[in-house]
């Protein structure tokens, strides 16, 4: 009889563990050496049932999470693959505590759920020319570092386009961009981590030469097209 009761308890408790849903707006802090860094996470399920999210921290607002994994009460997520956060939801689902990996260090964090998720829709651009649509690669020289950037612009049915820029050497950080094209002139505004780009597309449609600007600093940036 005792074994049957224990089995019943296990069967009853298993669905409760699976039902834990981290959707919502979370606010907390990461314990850095000598100080705390405040940050916020927004998590919500897509129509397909997958978990999506965004992080806001230190001047970055609503940066898309590249990965969100939930298993029972365990959760792991990141916007940069080299800066993952792993944690555990409290039994009442009101808090998440765990560790963040930053610059190779494991640092504790804690968050509390404060309300509903505040996710913004993916920004759309007007459709671009065939010469601009596609994948472009460039390299930034900044503060003694060489950072590879990848720009993708994809036209969508209905006359819109989706733009993204990937910082390859910063954990694959991927940010949405709003692209505006007027003839050979191309501008884009970077979302999440503010920045902008202005450039000129050459006659052959193989090179985009311009300047990337962030926090008042402008840096030359030339993109070349990936072969179609």
Regions found by a protein language model. Give the residues of each.
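Sec/Tat signal peptide C-region and signal peptidase I cleavage site
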Residues: 15-19
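Central antiparallel beta-sheet cores of small beta-barrel/beta-sandwich binding domains
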Residues: 20-92, 97, 101-103, 120-203, ...
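N-terminal targeting/docking segments
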Residues: 5, 116-120
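Short beta-strand edge segments in extracellular beta-sheet folds
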Residues: 112-116, 224-228
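Sec-dependent N-terminal signal peptides
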Residues: 4-13
């Amino acid at each position: 009889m005792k074994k049957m009761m224990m089995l019943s308890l296990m069967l009853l408790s298993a669905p409760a563990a699976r039902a834990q849903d981290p959707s919502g707006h979370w606010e907390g802090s990461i314990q850095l050496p000598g100080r705390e860094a405040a940050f916020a996470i927004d998590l919500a399920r897509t129509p397909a049932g997958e978990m999506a999210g965004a992080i806001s921290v230190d001047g970055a607002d609503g940066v898309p999470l590249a990965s969100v994994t939930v298993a029972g009460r365990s959760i792991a997520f990141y916007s940069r693959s080299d800066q993952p956060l792993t944690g555990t939801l409290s039994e009442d689902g009101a808090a998440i505590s765990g560790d963040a990996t930053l610059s190779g260090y494991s640092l504790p964090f804690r968050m509390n759920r404060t309300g509903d998720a505040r996710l913004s829709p993916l920004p759309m651009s007007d459709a671009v020319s065939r010469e601009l649509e596609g994948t472009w690669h460039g390299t930034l020289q900044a503060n003694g570092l060489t950072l590879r950037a990848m720009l993708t612009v994809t036209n969508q049915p209905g006359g819109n386009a989706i733009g993204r820029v990937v910082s390859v050497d910063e954990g694959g950080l991927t940010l949405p961009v709003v692209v505006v094209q007027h003839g050979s002139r191309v501008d884009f505004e970077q979302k999440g981590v503010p920045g902008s780009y202005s450039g000129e597309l050459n006659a052959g449609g193989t090179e985009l030469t311009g300047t990337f600007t962030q926090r008042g600093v402008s840096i030359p940036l030339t993109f070349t097209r990936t072969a179609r």
